[in-house]
Amino acid sequence: MKKLVATAPRVAALVEYEDRAVEAHEVKIRARFGAPKHGTEVVDFRAASPFIDEEFNAEWQMFTPREEGTARGIEFGKFQLGNMIVGDIIECGDDVTEYQIGDSVCCYGPLQETVIVNAVNNYKLRKMPQGASWKNAVCYDPAQFAMSGVRDANIRVGDFVVVVGLGAIGQIAIQLAKKAGASVVIGVDPIEHRCEIARRHGADHCLNPIGTDVGLEIKKLTGKQGADVIIETSGFADALQSALRGLAYGGTISYVAFAKPFAEGFNLGREAHFNNAKIVFSRAGSEPNPDYPRWSRKRIEETCWELLMNGYLNCDDLIDPVVTFTTSPESYMTYVDQHPELSIKMGVTF
């Protein structure tokens, strides 16, 4: 049996593992499809994550150094790559009552041939409806962060909306914004293929930020007013600077990205100072949710799964390219790390 592991920063490999029997509360899934996470996971893969030497302390609600002698947050050689898997249950523990052998399911899990997960009171272990798209299923995670960004931005009917960064989260945000009633939806991404897909699924316009004054172009497309809402998923300083320039007076930037450190030159003066800009940091996994107690991470997940399985969201175009598990180390290094412009969200078949 093999699993996909980061053996060193920016190096992926298939490594042998020994399978085990399930415990009473567990099921074993034979993976058929899967996908990695192109955002935070690749930051970890590049050894650029704050979680390596620090941890987010829930009591203090801040990053603090890991205690001396404790394991690092990411240990290369043990760090498994992958985010979602779809497959069939091949073994059930004695206490499992909601699932049976042969069920097709989707869950969080690394890219490996078999995955063992808790199957007692685990709503994250999702049964796949008959005929459901595996490509939609592996977008379960990015859909949550897209929905959170849209909700936290408070998009309303008639709004002018911009989505910066057209990876999986941005593409799903485009669909949600348009379906929420936005009158003008603008995508921003330098990759034309991504822009084509965004136009196919709701974007009225797309802008290439390279060599373009994105803020000015947003103002031109909205009759000089600017965007009511900008959803920023890229994490780059230039993108946020352009968003502040293209935002309408009193508008909201929903900041979804797990940002990289900003270089010298980022400016919170200029348009941000004059136009009463609001920046809301949006993260589906942070509890309590801004709309607690009505909304929680669980409700976001339940809603996203329903929208993915009933076809309200269409992610078939987003899973690109699709590679085999056998070639996944080289494919991961190429499409996820070295040349992310060649992919949106890489799919894996077993």
Model-based region annotation:
Residues 1-73, 349-350:
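Short N-terminal strand-loop motif that marks the start
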Residues 26, 103-104, 114, 160, ...:
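Residue-level marker of beta-strand positions
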Residues 29, 107-108, 163:
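A generic structural signal for residues embedded in beta-strands
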Residues 69-109:
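A glycine-/small-residue-rich N-terminal strand-loop-strand element
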Residues 80, 109-121:
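A structural motif shared across PLP-dependent enzymes of the aminotransferase-like
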Residues 133-212, 216:
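Mid-domain Rossmann-like dinucleotide-binding core that forms the NAD(H)/NADP(H) cofactor-binding site
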Residues 155, 201-280:
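Glycine-rich cofactor phosphate-binding loops and adjacent beta1-alpha1 units
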Residues 244, 249, 291-350:
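C-terminal hydrophobic helical "lid"/dimerization subdomain
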